[in-house]
């Protein structure tokens, strides 16, 4: 019996997968529990169309992420730290960076996307790695100046 999986079934199939299953297993277990439905021409077309739409949405999201990466890598964020005798009285946290990106560049990021981030308290140019998703990482430049 040809069925369409409505959700993931361990050892059998994944959601929206079309697969041939034994009649008894499908009728007695999978269909009554709402895990699968019969694969008719209309339902198969619907599943294929849904997969095409999902693929297009994923491609669009990847393109937007790549565009965000390009934008982030062009930005240089500047912070000023009060320094006395070579020691900083304050440090720049990932939340400070997120806030400045949001306020000055209208870019909204989650502070948990920063890779191996440690608060910045040294004068100079720092590179921050940010995971954007889909395996794409951006290097943001942060310049700290002493006051």
Swiss-Prot record:
Single GO term (MF): structural constituent of ribosome
Keywords: Ribonucleoprotein, Ribosomal protein, RNA-binding, rRNA-binding
Disulfide-bonded cysteines: none
GO biological process, one term: translation
GO CC annotations, alphabetized: ribonucleoprotein complex; ribosome
Family in the record: Belongs to the bacterial ribosomal protein bL9 family.
Its job: Binds to the 23S rRNA.
Protein's UniProt name: Large ribosomal subunit protein bL9
Chain's gene name: rplI
